[in-house]
């Protein structure tokens, strides 16, 4: 399967989770084995020669692609979670959302100064969650941080929220 064919497998769900929103449902792509293999290969090909040591997947849909990417690269996977979900000592970052404030956490020992990290989430919309995760990982002083998405909604300009010196990639753009 070719990369551009993946878009045909993503379901559009109007008015979800609220009126006026067009939700891009990746589960219809993920349930197709050939599409999942294509996604895995395409994600991994971006980073194969970059020395990546950790992939951070953002709760919860970022766990799917992030785990696959870590497996394909033969590196570690680190979950970025909502508050209270990680059992050991954590560091956290609060960030603004449309209707309030949310927080993201990592184990305090998850990233070291020797790590080259890919931050992964399924979809880039406004960029707030990824920016918070980026700032949190940056505070742990890794060698390098890359940012990756399966889908990017370009009209929402989420890239503009991310640092300009950050290499951002997405497999599919709408």
Locate predicted features.
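PRPP-associated nucleotide enzymes
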Residues: 1-174
């Amino acid at each position: 399967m070719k990369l551009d064919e993946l878009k045909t497998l993503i379901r559009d769900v109007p008015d979800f989770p609220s009126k006026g929103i067009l939700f891009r449902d990746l589960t219809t792509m993920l349930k197709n084995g050939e599409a999942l293999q294509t996604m895995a290969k395409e994600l991994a090909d971006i980073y194969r020669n970059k020395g990546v040591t950790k992939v951070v997947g953002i709760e919860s849909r970022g766990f799917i692609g992030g785990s696959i990417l870590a497996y394909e690269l033969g590196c570690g996977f680190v979950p970025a979670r909502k508050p209270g979900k990680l059992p050991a000592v954590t560091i956290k970052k609060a960030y603004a959302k449309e209707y309030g404030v949310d927080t993201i956490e990592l184990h305090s020992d998850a990233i070291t100064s020797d790590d080259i990290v890919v931050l992964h989430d399924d979809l880039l919309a406004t960029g707030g969650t990824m920016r918070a995760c980026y700032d949190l990982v940056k505070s742990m002083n890794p060698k390098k941080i890359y940012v990756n998405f399966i889908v990017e909604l370009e009209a929402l300009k989420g890239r503009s929220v991310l640092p300009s010196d950050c290499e951002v990639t997405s497999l599919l753009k709408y």
